[in-house]
Amino acid sequence: MLKKKSILAALACALALGAWSGSTLATPITVGGVTWDPNSLLDLNVQALNFRESSVGSVSNVLTGYGMIGSFNGQNQSYFCPGCDLTFTFQYTVSNITGSQVEFNSGFINFFVDNTSSFNTLNPTTAGIGTPWLTLSGHNGSFLGFVGTAQLFSTIQGTVSKPLTGSSGIGFLDATGGPAAPFLQTHTQADGMGGFADFTLNSSFLFSAVRGCTLSPNPTNVCHYPISGTATLIGRSVAVPEPGAAGLLGLGLAFLGLLTWRRRKEGDGQS
C-alpha cells in the first residue's frame, strides 16, 4: 500500500512539474541584444513609427527605404533594445500598375542591431549598420481587389509618384535569415492563395519630402527618400523552453520512471 502511495505521489509530482514547466515555456527571448516576450498578448507586433522611402512611378522601378523599429510587442526601445537601435533597410520592384493599384515583387527587409545608437532619420547611412539580426524575404500572395499575385500591394491616393494621405500597403514576408529567424518561422499568416507566410506587413505613407529637399539620385542623401510612413509587421513567435524548466520536468519524469521500475522489479521478485 505504501509503495502504491509512493508511486501516486511521484506521479502527482511529475504532473505538477510538467504544468509548471509548461507555464514557463514562453519567457522573454533575447537574440542579439533584442528582447521580447513571446507570451505577450500582442505577440507578434513590430512597428516602425517613421520610415522613409524612394518614389516610384512605373513598372521595373525599384523602391528602397530605411527606418528604425519603435515598438516591439507594445514595448518601447528601452525594453526591447536597451542601448541599441534596431534599424532596417528594404527594397521592392514594381511589377504592375493598374490605376491606383501598385504591385511589387522581389522584396526583402534586412534588420540590424546597432549598438552605437546612432540612427538619425535625416541620415540614411545610419540605417542598416551594425550586426545583421533578421532577413525577411517577400512571399507571393494575393489580395482582394488586385488582379495579380505579388509580395506587396499598394493602394494609392493621389499619384503613384506622389501619394497622398490615405495611401496604404499590405504584403507578405517570410523569415529567411539572421539569428532571429528560427524564433519567427511560424507560418501563421494566410497569403490568400491557400498558403501561409511568417508575416503580414501593413503600412501607410504619403509624399512628405524633407523641407528644402529637391529629389536626389544619391541613395545616401535623405532627399532621395521623399515619402514618409509607418508600418506594422504581424506574426507569431516560437516559444522556446527555458533550460531550467525543461530540466525539472525531465527530473520529475525520471523519478516517476525509477519508482515504477522498482515497483515492477519488486513485484517480479515476490511472484
Where are these regions (language model features)?
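N-terminal segment immediately downstream of the Sec signal-peptide cleavage site
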Residues: 26-104, 196-239
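Small side chains
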Residues: 18, 65-67, 148, 158, ...
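C-terminal segment of classical bacterial N-terminal signal peptides
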Residues: 17-24
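C-terminal membrane-anchoring or membrane-association module
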Residues: 258-271
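Hydrophobic helical h-region of N-terminal Sec-dependent signal peptides
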Residues: 11-17, 255
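Bacterial N-terminal signal peptides that target proteins for export
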Residues: 2-10
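A short, hydrophobic C-terminal helix/tail in secreted or cell-surface proteins
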Residues: 242-261
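Short helix-loop boundary/capping segments
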Residues: 106-107, 111-194
